[in-house]
Amino acid sequence: MNDLIMIVIRFLLYLDLMVIFGLPFFQIYGISGVRHETYNLTNFRSFITFAVVTGIILTGINMLLVSNAMSGVTDLRELSIHVIEMVIEETDVGISWIVRLCALFTTLGALFLYTNKRVLSCLLMTMSGGVALATLAWGGHAVMHDGLHYYLHLLSDLTHLGAAGAWTGALVAFAILLMRRNEHNAQSVIVISDSLAKFATAGTVIVVALILSALVNYLYIAEGNLTPLFNSSWGRILLAKTALFVLMLLLAAANRFHLGPRLEVMVREGNYDRSVALMRNSILTEFVVAIIILGAVAWLGMLAPSQVS
């Protein structure tokens, strides 16, 4: 039961911190020159606020669960403040919690600038959100090596986290934009269409970064051995995750090369309702697949390739 709870908390942290980083980041490169008529459409302040508060709570729960596991006590109520302090002060994962909390509170502070200085606010939130997201690397396989390989594997994992966070944040942004049906008009649909076009280039960079960093991570975790893919739970989950990633690529390709251009044409013709609905369904499907992948990632971090099943 404790392992299941830990996996759920890890999953929620992955999703939450990726939104905190990816949503304001998307506003920097994906949404610019917003007109007054569509200002509310692109206002993500309430979503980011909720994510930050949730991230602080989840980090606190994660601190308790990990400290409990390290202390060896069977009941969480037996966990002492002394043990928690020791984990925080003497372990890398403990230090990462403090860094994450500082970054999350910084993000919370940057939200106060959102209304009057949105670009500056999003820039600050992207940086602090990126730091918060990066701390997840110290809770998985990225720190299993020593020396130079420690830093190379960590850099690869940070790249993977950043790229995944950028993609997840963009999906959340598009989902929010497309779900606000009562605010859709010619101007708002133009904002969505333009944002899709801007994400096309960023999406290519994200996919390349994900693939390359995934290969490096696998080489480090499995030591270049293909056997764990087929004789361990870790390998089978990784294969399932890879299949889902391919599905995401197909959906993203459909958005970029078919649904996006079609929406652009329909906007010019003034008949965009059907195209918006199709794009909404595609984005939501892609987002659901992304959520399942994050669940797999949270599970993978609790397993080792050497655990044959």
From Swiss-Prot:
Family stated for the protein in its record: Belongs to the CopD family.
InterPro entries: CopC/D, CopD, Cu-R_CopD_dom
Any one GO biological process: copper ion transport
GO CC field: plasma membrane
Membrane topology category: Multi-pass membrane protein
Protein's name in the database: Copper resistance protein D
Subcellular location as annotated: Cell inner membrane
Disulfide bonds: none
Main location: membrane
Transmembrane segments: 11-31, 46-66, 93-113, 119-139, 158-178, 202-222, 234-254, 283-303
Function, as annotated: Required for the copper-inducible expression of copper resistance.
Keywords from the UniProt entry: Cell inner membrane, Cell membrane, Copper, Membrane, Plasmid, Transmembrane, Transmembrane helix
